[in-house]
Amino acid sequence: MRSTPPASAGRSTPPALAGHSTPPALAGHSTLCGRPVAGDRALIMAIVNRTPDSFYDKGATFSDAAARDAVHRAVADGADVIDVGGVKAGPGERVDVDTEITRLVPFIEWLRGAYPDQLISVDTWRAQVAKAACAAGADLINDTWGGVDPAMPEVAAEFGAGLVCAHTGGALPRTRPFRVSYGTTTRGVVDAVISQVTAAAERAVAAGVAREKVLIDPAHDFGKNTFHGLLLLRHVADLVMTGWPVLMALSNKDVVGETLGVDLTERLEGTLAATALAAAAGARMFRVHEVAATRRVLEMVASIQGVRPPTRTVRGLA
C-alpha cells in the first residue's frame, strides 16, 4: 500500500502513478490496517462466504468446518486479506441483522485467534453488523453497497478500522437495476465512479478514518452493465491517479461471463486476464476466489514491472 496517503482525492498525480507506469511497492512486506501484507505485488483479498446461497460456491463454505478449511487454504496460498461475508450480494432470501451477525462474529473471533496477524475484512453494508465484526477482530470494512448506511464511516473510525468505498450508482443492496445509464458520453461511467468514490473516501477521512486505511472500489456488476465494466477496466489508471488505493472485485463476475459467453465455472481465464491488466495499471488489491492463481498472475506482473525479482534462476541470471 502507499506509505504516504494523498492529501486529497484531487491532488496532482504522484510520479509513480502517472499513466500506466509501475505502481508503488515496498520490498518484501508492507502493512495495511496494522497487519503485514505483501509489499512487492498487488494485494489479494480471499473470499470466504458464510452464506448458503453464494452466487459462485452455492454455500460451499457455509459450514464452520468448510469455512475454516477455506481460510487455511487461502492463507497457505498467499492471501493478504480474508474477506468474510454473511449475506449473498445478489437477490435472495432476506437475511436480518441478527442472522448476519450470527454467521460472522463467531467465525471472525475464531479467525482472529487462529491467525493473530492476518488482516481480516468484513463484507457488509450494515453499520450494526460492521460494529460487531470489528469488535470481534475485523480490521477492514468492505462496504460493497457504497455507503447505503451513512453510519459506516463512524464505525470504522471508532475501531480504527479501514474502509472500502464502493460505487453502486445508487443501486440498493441486493438489487440488479435494469438498463442502467450514465449519460451519453463515452466516459460517463468512469467520471461517475471517480466522483462518487473519491467523495466517499473524503467523507470517511472527515469522519475520522485514517487516510491510509481507505480504499476505493469501482464495484463491477454493481449498478453497471458489462459495457460499463469493460470501460472501467480500460480506465483503471484514471482511478489509480486519484491517489486512493484501488480494490478490484472481478472474480468470476458477469462482466467476464457475458464478455466471453461462458458459464460460471469457466470464468477463471477471463478473470485473470482482467486482473493482469488492472494490476499493470496500478490497482492495489484484488478480491478473489482463486488465491493461488491470482498470486502467480500478480507476481508475474510485478516482476515484469521491475518491482519483484524472479524467484529462482535457471538461465544464469545474476
Curated annotation (Swiss-Prot):
Residues 42-299 form the Pterin-binding domain. It comes from the Bacteria. GO terms for biological process: folic acid-containing compound biosynthetic process. The record marks H220 as: Characteristic for family members without dihydropteroate synthase activity. Residues 1-25 are annotated as: Disordered. Pfam families: Pterin_bind. GO terms for cellular component: cytosol. Homodimer. Has very low affinity for the DHPS substrate 6-hydroxymethyl-7,8-dihydropterin-pyrophosphate, but can bind the inhibitor dapsone. Seems to lack dihydropteroate synthase activity, and does probably not function in folate metabolism. Belongs to the DHPS family. NCBIfam families: DHPS. This is Inactive dihydropteroate synthase 2. It comes from Mycobacterium tuberculosis (strain ATCC 25618 / H37Rv).
